[in-house]
Amino acid sequence: GSGGAADPPDADAGDAAPEATAELTGLGDPYYPDVGNSGYDVGDYALDLTWHPDEQRMDGVTTITAVATDDLTRFSLDAVDLDVSSVTVDGEPATATPTGERDLIVEPAEPLGQGDEFVVVVTYAAAPQLLAGADLLSPGWVADGDEVYVAFEPHGAATLFPSNDHPSDKATYSFTVTVPTGLDVAANGMLRGAVPGDGVTTFSFSAPDQMATYLVQLVIADLDVVESTGPGGLPVRHVIDADVGGVVEGPLARTAEMIDVFDDLFGPYPFVAYGVVVVDEPLGYALETQTLPIFGTDAVTSEPTLVHELAHQWFGDSVTPATWQDIWLNEGFATYAELLWRERTGQGGPDDLAATYAEPTPLLDLPPADPGPTELFAPSVYDRGALTLYVLDRTVGRDVFLTILRTWLERYDDSSATTGDFEAVAEEVSGAELTPMFDAWLRAPQMPDLDDWVG
């Protein structure tokens, strides 16, 4: 997507009116320059969706509340192949023009001034589709018969709802989802109600914590909900396809213990609820969708994967990468968190990773802080990212290391941040000069030799 800019800074009264000079610009993501939009900041998305399985169609009314960060005569939303029937801005009909592969350019009846709050309502229909993605993931949403699930990382949310589909613009969400009787719905946050109608049920959810678009989850299926209470009274709900049996007796039974360990290491769990959603197929991946990570029948029996996706609630979901180049802030940290869990539970720990990579390997000859757009999920992002944290942990000592992580999480909670932001926190808290270490481990093409960095 792209967005509207104001007059260029050198414009004066003699120049053309803003309509002529306004330009639509993206957010400048280094990997996905056409994703996301400038000119405004979204505060809230209200998604009202109706699933028609017979037609494999989702009817949607998405209400976006935003603030203009520039004077705007027009602005852009990310919208991929949405069949848009109407758009209003502040209740007045607006012109909407699909442009390129991702953009819906909206021209309101009246220009918006910098600082104005405005409300956009888009009425549309969407069909399931997956986009070309990076490595493991083809982002988008899947319908299998009556059933629906989503996995949007990195830029697939725009296949289901018009949005500023970039992790630097987080917002609160509510969901109202109408499905044929007999189907259930799971979504981020808390279930607020399920109201039966004529052959349908309407489920509503609120997700009051700041959330990136790629972390939205929506599952429609015949679902069983298993409820319990986690540390500090945290609501824990596991939502499991009714055709999937027995998973709650596996490593999933340790969920409260996992939360407890990470609360102790990293600070309080950041959101209103937790639990996983399990769909009835082997997905080949799991994704840390906020408050409700998605698992297939394969990964839900893996304790390390359950731990990894929980860790992402802190690292990735609460503190989100400001650009996709910063993806190691998600994956390296969740990988290191797995090792800290193993250490706490007597199953080894960080030294195991160091032993695995005692000798440099070409597998990790990719800089974690710049893997490239097709390698977001490369082994180096996970393991060399985690080794960077291992070297940091060993360099500053465990107490200082955990203070760095907690400071990072407190400072950027509900926000997005960069690799540079993390390096600054690490140096500030430790008082150490860490640039050479970060340069070697995050940015050098070749994997460093661990022996050169840890005694």
Q: Where do the PLM segments sit?
A:
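Acidic/His-enriched low-complexity segments
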Residues: 1-257, 261-269, 394-396, 436
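Active-site rim elements
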Residues: 159-166, 244-250, 322-324, 372-379, ...
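Zinc-dependent metallopeptidase catalytic helix centered on the HExxH motif
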Residues: 168, 291-352
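Structural recognition of the beta-strand scaffold that forms the well-ordered cores
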Residues: 204, 237-238, 270, 275-278, ...
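Soluble non-cytosolic domains of exported or imported proteins
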Residues: 245-256, 300-301, 305, 324, ...
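Catalytic zinc-binding patch centered on the HExxH motif and its immediate surroundings
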Residues: 248-250, 265-270, 278-291, 301
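Beta/coil-rich, acidic/histidine-enriched accessory regions frequently appended to metallopeptidases
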Residues: 285, 411-455
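Acidic/His/Gly-enriched intrinsically disordered linker/tail segments
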Residues: 325-395, 406, 412, 439-455
